[in-house]
Design a protein with these regions (language model features):
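Core structural elements
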Residues: 55, 60, 108-110, 117, ...
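Amphipathic alpha-helical blocks
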Residues: 73, 83-108
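Short secondary-structure subsegments characteristic of cysteine-rich extracellular domains
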Residues: 377-400
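A conserved non-catalytic segment of reverse transcriptases
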Residues: 220, 296-362, 366-368
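Short, solvent-exposed helix-loop connector elements
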Residues: 231-234, 345-359, 370-382, 402, ...
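Non-catalytic, polymerase-adjacent accessory regions of viral genome-replication enzymes
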Residues: 1-87
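Extended C-terminal regions of large enzymes
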Residues: 393, 402-468
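Conserved polymerase palm-domain catalytic core
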Residues: 98-113, 117, 149-313
Length: 468
């Protein structure tokens, strides 16, 4: 596979090969390797030759593997990730030549809508797999350059950082006495980024005009929405590998302004919280930082959703905060709890047609994932209550699956219920949910039996994170 990829992504035929003594003349200039079919050629690059670094075979090979690993649906050309390699074998030379001479034109992204928790739709733009390959190559090259510039209080879409780091950072700030929050809400951030402002910010660091031009082409590539082409005058469509990096580059200007003012904050993508020691100070910060965002960055602040509040109960990344004995604690926000319960209800519904094995698998996957994300929260009591509710749901599913009276009676007897009680309950006209909560079904299908059958529990998953 490695040799195949080298042949697929190698380019620059006839590039002159330098010996080691000649390369010593490039003092202070970074180099990369062109892997050709016949030899390895070392080519110098600097800040004005960033494009050569982006399209280097090693970088493109990594980008190819990343796109293949991430999978994802096809773009407007309907090319799948599996079809990418044959296409590259036939068109690699033309692709790299078009990137070098500036004739490369990205395809419009495919509009995809996914529902949000608030009932609205999140708009995604899915690039073609070849555009994803090039975007990924750009992202891999620019990320280490910009990582040196990004704030340590920015956590979204960055290497070795995540939501839990942002939450721990917020806890430390609250522990230092900053107990009032400006919960900043940027209105449709990814859809309203100013292209001219973003290009201006990029130009401060990227001195290779060809790379700036290529990024600009992606920003203005347009959208195919239900077969109709729409221009993209603003925004960085979510869905491509480059969008998260561009959003961080844009909002790094906000980070720098907050740092300059000495204001503690945490930011995960476009989700920011600024902390103050008093409510009056927080209100002043809200007004002044809104002016900066709208005036300098040309972004829109949702004034109705941007709130100033005491830290208790504020929702951030699915968690909420409270202070106990002078220390900031985390709990699961009420909306996240309700969403989890609705999902468990869906997974234990008889209408999905799953058998016992499939239901166990789906429940275990969801429970482990959910508890894995929320394991920072103090939630033992909540999980114990939810486990009781979940076991009742499972008993209801099992009771429903028995269907016929004869089957119900026979299975109750097998589970240790005497024949008379089994006959009474097998013929009962009570609803499924009421019977699932009855003492008879709790005796017949005990917690231990459910556990032995392989049904996962929330507390069981939580104990794996907190063994003591």
């Amino acid at each position: 596979m490695k040799e195949r990829m080298q042949k697929t992504l190698a380019e620059v035929k006839g590039c002159p090969q330098k010996d080691r003594t000649e390369s010593e003349g490039y003092v202070g200039v970074q180099t990369f390797m062109w892997i050709c079919e016949d030899n390895i050629v070392e080519v110098p690059f600097d800040k004005e030759h960033l494009l050569e670094r982006i399209i280097s075979p090693d970088n493109l090979r990594k980008a190819y593997k990343a796109v293949l690993r991430n999978k994802g649906c096809s773009g407007i050309d309907k090319m799948s990730c599996e079809q990418m390699l044959p296409w590259l074998l036939a068109n690699k030379d033309a692709l790299i030549r078009s990137l070098l001479d500036g004739s490369y034109r990205p395809n419009p992204v495919k509009r995809v809508e996914i529902p949000k928790d608030n009932g609205k739709m999140r708009l995604l733009g899915i690039p073609t797999v070849i555009d994803r390959l090039v975007q990924q190559a750009i992202n891999q090259t620019l990320t280490p350059i910009y990582e040196r510039q990004f704030s340590p209080r920015s956590y979204g879409f960055r290497p070795r950082r995540g939501c839990h780091d942002a939450l721990r950072g917020a806890q430390k700030i609250v522990d230092d006495g900053y107990i009032y929050v400006v919960d900043l809400d940027l209105e449709r951030f990814f859809d309203t980024v100013s292209h001219s402002k973003l290009i201006e910010i990029l130009s401060h660091t990227i001195k290779d005009g060809r790379v700036i031009s290529l990024i600009h082409k992606y920003l203005r590539s347009g959208v195919m929405n239900k077969g109709m082409f729409e221009t993209s005058e603003e925004g960085t469509p979510q869905g491509g590998p480059l969008s998260p990096l561009l959003s961080n580059i844009m909002l790094n200007e906000l980070d720098k302004e907050l740092t300059r003012r000495g204001l503690p904050f945490v930011r995960y993508a476009d989700d920011s919280m600024i902390f103050c020691k008093s409510k009056r100070a927080a209100k002043r910060v809200k007004e002044s930082i809104t002016r900066f965002i709208e005036g300098k960055l040309h972004l829109k602040v949702n004034r109705d959703k941007t709130i100033v509040s005491y830290v208790k109960g504020v929702k951030y990344l699915g968690y909420s905060f409270y202070v106990m004995k002078g220390k900031c604690q985390l709990t699961v926000h009420a909306k996240a709890k309700a969403k989890m319960k609705a999902k468990l209800k869906e997974l234990t519904s008889r209408s999905n047609g799953w058998g016992y094995a499939k239901r166990k698998q789906k429940l275990e996957e969801y429970i482990k994932g959910w508890v894995g994300y929320y394991h920072l929260a103090n939630m033992k009591r909540f999980l114990i209550e939810m486990d009781e509710w979940l076991r009742r749901r499972l008993r209801m599913c099992i009771w429903k699956s028995w269907k016929r009276v004869k089957t119900k009676v026979a299975n109750l007897v097998k589970c240790g219920i005497d024949k008379y009680q089994a006959y009474l309950w097998g013929n009962s006209r009570l609803g499924y949910w009421r019977i699932a909560g009855s003492y008879i079904l709790s005796r017949a299908i005990t917690n231990e039996k459910l556990s032995m059958a392989g049904y996962a529990t929330l507390m069981g998953a939580y104990i794996e994170w907190h063994p003591k």
